[in-house]
Amino acid sequence: MARLFTPSESKYYLMALDAGTGSIRAVIFDLEGNQIAVGQAEWRHLAVPDVPGSMEFDLNKNWQLACECMRQALHNAGIAPEYIAAVSACSMREGIVLYNNEGTPIWACANVDARAAREVSELKELHNNTFENEVYRATGQTLALSAIPRLLWLAHHRSDIYRQASTITMISDWLAYMLSGELAVDPSNAGTTGLLDLTTRNWKPALLDMAGLRADILSPVKETGTLLGVVSSQAAELCGLKAGTPVVVGGGDVQLGCLGLGVVRPAQTAVLGGTFWQQVVNLAAPVTDPEMNVRVNPHVIPGMVQAESISFFTGLTMRWFRDAFCAEEKLIAERLGIDTYTLLEEMASRVPPGSWGVMPIFSDRMRFKTWYHAAPSFINLSIDPDKCNKATLFRALEENAAIVSACNLQQIADFSNIHPTSLVFAGGGSKGKLWSQILADVSGLPVNIPVVKEATALGCAIAAGVGAGIFSSMAETGERLVRWERTHTPDPEKHELYQDSRDKWQAVYQDQLGLVDHGLTTSLWKAPGL
């Protein structure tokens, strides 16, 4: 690749825009992958009155927030805009943006938008009830969160928007467009629309034709790390970057997070522990799960895909437990100057493995085709306060998260025949040393913890550097920049104990799903169209 930019004696930096479900961040890195500064703002997605499950993305307000974050990051870093060598954007997957033929963004929804439940059900009936299977085999996605039912909903209920729509992109692509005026999507993020072929890494318009939808709205596809354009004069005035700064194609948050963790080779495995836990295994070539339990997404590394099995609301469940039951521990932790989770882990470390048999019922393993969960509960409690208390319940939650993670990894192994020899644990969950050790003991695998645990923005910055010609290869740079904090080695005796706990939990969870099926309890979450 020709070098578009050559660092001189002066110090240059890369900027990553990270558009998550709950916030937007502008993060500045130096060329060695060190985070220099960040600007961050929370955003909320709007429920439309009388549209159940809707979660619209406020294009005008959120662009203003993104610009504020870029200015804030530059201010916090204390550097002039001309020292930003390139910028790229990543975002939550599944969120889509529509544009009219003049290039004006006219409608967008967030990843969690579930308004199209009826359309999902209708689409499943197409082709003698085989349409969803056809979508999955080609794209690795089911219909529940794909773009197809959302577009059909617009055709049914907002025909004014549907008729105007000229182009579709993802939210990361929208940020790049607002900076540069250039429209394109990348495979890693666009792959979650259910419209992108895993093998060709390009659109499969026949799927829209089958659904009776327009196929003329598909934008150009460019690989992550490709130079898209430059920051326009108009955008520069708003965001504080210098006009002419290279804008580089970004991607999906999980895939770029894996790049930032150096998870770039076939069979490498990561557990990303945030609000959701993603269990991700790199596959050398596209293959899908015959049981349709696991989603398959394009990696940002061309030719490679990722099998991804998701645990639902894992981080959110821990936060609920802390906020609902641990007010005393929050006060004690504040006085001690430590994080509440650190105190709770210290308490939980005195509870024996297995947590006295307590079984949390929250997320199931992923069942992508029929994705729903049991009602949240704790099973097999004791009224002995020495055995059943906050420390026990907290440890049980950490153990259960690891058990669900192991189940998710197992079902990936079942269809891919890839059995990892170690895994990378990142995200907020990996800050917990007890949790990391429990994950090693439950999975039976060495667990490696990186120094940079929130690696999505770093992966995005690497893509920016490749597009600007600073780095020659995304994979090589990801491997070079990742640094390791610690490794947790599994204990064979505890692994055997947790195998028994896992078997019991799976049997109990099936019974709990039966209560939901009979309308006696309420599911933690149910996919649209079920």
From Swiss-Prot:
Q: Which reaction does it catalyse?
A: (S)-4,5-dihydroxypentane-2,3-dione + ATP = (2S)-2-hydroxy-3,4-dioxopentyl phosphate + ADP + H(+)
Q: Which residues form a coiled coil?
A: none
Grouped into one coarse class, the protein's main location is: cytoplasm
Q: Which GO terms describe its molecular function?
A: autoinducer-2 kinase activity
BP GO terms, sorted: carbohydrate metabolic process; quorum sensing
Q: What is its EC number?
A: 2.7.1.189
Q: Which InterPro entries match?
A: AI-2_kinase, ATPase_NBD, Carb_kinase_FGGY, FGGY_C, FGGY_Carb_Kinase, FGGY_N
Name the Pfam families for this protein.
Answer: FGGY_C, FGGY_N
Q: Which UniProt keywords apply?
A: Cytoplasm, Kinase, Transferase
Query: What does the UniProt entry say about where the protein is found?
Result: Cytoplasm
Which family does this protein fall into? Belongs to the FGGY kinase family.
What is known about what this protein does? Catalyzes the phosphorylation of autoinducer-2 (AI-2) to phospho-AI-2, which subsequently inactivates the transcriptional regulator LsrR and leads to the transcription of the lsr operon. Phosphorylates the ring-open form of (S)-4,5-dihydroxypentane-2,3-dione (DPD), which is the precursor to all AI-2 signaling molecules, at the C5 position.
Q: Which NCBIfam families match?
A: PRK10939.1
Q: What is this protein called?
A: Autoinducer-2 kinase
Which organism is this entry from? Escherichia coli (strain ATCC 8739 / DSM 1576 / NBRC 3972 / NCIMB 8545 / WDCM 00012 / Crooks)
Gene for this chain = lsrK
